């Protein structure tokens, strides 16, 4: 759920950011070019975001925490049984 919300915030920030000065006024000759450019920009930003998440220590720490918690609960259930 948090990943979904994070991605939603990234997409909204990209959309609300607007055009950069180098882009200027888009050419209306082919509206699909604008859509294709937006898709490529969005793809690059999402890939960068996913790489940032996968290279961080957060997933490893979370996995370790879940493993440790599961092990503790399992031990408590063995003792009580």
From Swiss-Prot:
Pfam families, A to Z: ApoC-I (PF04691)
Gene Ontology, cellular component aspect: high-density lipoprotein particle; very-low-density lipoprotein particle
Domain of life, source organism: Eukaryota
Family matches, as Gene3D superfamilies: Apolipoprotein C-I
MF terms in GO: fatty acid binding; phospholipase inhibitor activity
Signal sequence annotation: 1-24
This protein's name: Apolipoprotein C-I, acidic form
Native organism taxonomy: Eukaryota, Metazoa, Chordata, Craniata, Vertebrata
Gene of this entry: APOC1A
């Amino acid at each position: 759920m948090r990943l979904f919300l994070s991605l939603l915030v990234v997409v909204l920030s990209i959309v609300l950011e607007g055009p950069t000065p180098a882009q200027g006024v888009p050419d209306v000759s082919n509206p699909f070019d604008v859509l294709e450019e937006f898709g490529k920009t969005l793809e690059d930003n999402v890939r960068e975001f996913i790489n940032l998440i996968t290279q961080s220590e957060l997933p490893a720490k979370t996995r370790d925490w879940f493993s440790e918690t599961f092990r503790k609960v399992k031990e408590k259930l063995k003792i009580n049984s």
